[in-house]
Every structure is written in C-alpha cells, then in structure tokens.
Amino acid sequence: MVRLGQVMYLHKDAYEEYAKRHAELWPEMKTALKKYGATNYSIFLNKLTGQTFAYLEVPDEATYNEIAETDICKKWWKYMEPLMDTNEDNSPVTTDLQEVFHLD
C-alpha cells in the first residue's frame, strides 16, 4: 500500500462550503475513489492558512491517477473550482508531500 499526502489551497471564504460539499460527497464520486483504489482517505483543514492536508492510501499510484481521466472526477473538480486554487483544467493546485516518518 502506498501512502500519499498532499496540500491543497482553499479560498478564505470557502471553508464551510468545502466541508459541506465533502460531507455530501456524491455517491458516484465515492464509488470512483474506491474503484481506483483509495482507502483510509482523510482531509484536514488549517483555518489559519486555508491549506488542506489530504492523506490516503492506494495500492499503486498509477492506477489511482487514472481517476483524473474520468467524467465524474472532472465534474467534481468543476463543482469544487469556485472554492479553491485550481489549474486550467479545474483540477486542484496541489503540492505532493514526501513521507519522512511512519509508525505501524
């Protein structure tokens, strides 16, 4: 299992709406996440900076990254775009983090 961590960047006035939309995650998006291997997925918010920290585990990154090509993922990105920093394709601007410690 591969452990992934990344930072994303929310707009200051979007914290509550971001949390609300994730609390109401579309069933189709949840199914896609699981289909492409995501497990133990959590997102944390730093209200002082607007940064989120996402953590998830996947069997392999290549399979998980294929989710970006699905219609449901692209629809979710468009839905979330007003709330966060995004790229031209509406995907969130992210910073991948390097794991430096793990304790089982």
Swiss-Prot record:
InterPro entries: Dimeric_a/b-barrel, L-rhamnose_mutarotase, Rham/fucose_mutarotase. Its EC number is 5.1.3.32. It is an enzyme of class 5 (isomerase). PANTHER family: L-RHAMNOSE MUTAROTASE. NCBIfam families: YiiL_rotase. HAMAP family: L_rham_rotase. Belongs to the rhamnose mutarotase family. This is L-rhamnose mutarotase.
